[in-house]
């Protein structure tokens, strides 16, 4: 016996495919969506379609954007001598929340993890190197404080230092094994201030 009408069962199934959404949460969300008026449902579904179709990656820094290059890369207000390397677009948001960082970004979309079979060629390092020839004086490595983040930071330092660019790593006021995106603004701000040369 089916507990739900087929369309609702399909909705619950699709919602439960999202990260962090289990069957019970998916069911709650489905019931919530069914209570919305039709225009709100259309608005919700259209916003998902728009986000998927209109969001792309910046060809310069790999961050999410609507236009290419992104607002960070094209802004004359940003410090173009400074690049902060992060693992994901969520980390860019975390850094921006501090209100302290005014440079550019480079998003790797991952970290080196030999255990998971992820090497340097599997993350977005290749387009970072040409950017360093454009007057960049410092690269701040802000990868997560875990084994993969450390491996990525060490690899980047070995790659960048011979080019004569200063390489620093954010200080570890962040919990070891934690994710940058979950750090509060004050902790992240202090970690940025206390960065050390690699």
UniProtKB/Swiss-Prot annotation:
Xref: Gene3D superfamilies: 3.30.60.80, 3.40.1360.10, 6.10.250.240, RecR Domain 1
Name under which the protein is recorded: Recombination protein RecR
The entry's keywords: DNA damage, DNA recombination, DNA repair, Metal-binding, Zinc, Zinc-finger
Known role: May play a role in DNA repair. It seems to be involved in an RecBC-independent recombinational process of DNA repair. It may act with RecF and RecO.
PROSITE patterns membership: RECR (PS01300), TOPRIM (PS50880)
UniProt zinc finger (C4-type) residues: 58-73
Disulfide bonds listed in the record: none
One protein family per Pfam: RecR_C
InterPro entries to which the protein is assigned, alphabetical: DNA_Rcmb_RecR (IPR000093), Hlx-hairpin-Hlx_DNA-bd_motif (IPR003583), Rcmb_RecR (IPR023627), Rcmb_RecR_Znf (IPR015967), TOPRIM_dom (IPR006171), TOPRIM_RecR (IPR034137)
Lineage: Bacteria, Bacillati, Bacillota, Clostridia, Halanaerobiales
Segments forming domain Toprim: 81-175
Family: Belongs to the RecR family.
Gene Ontology terms describing biological process: DNA recombination; DNA repair
GO molecular function terms attached to this record: DNA binding; zinc ion binding
CDD domains: TOPRIM_recR (cd01025)
HAMAP family linked: RecR
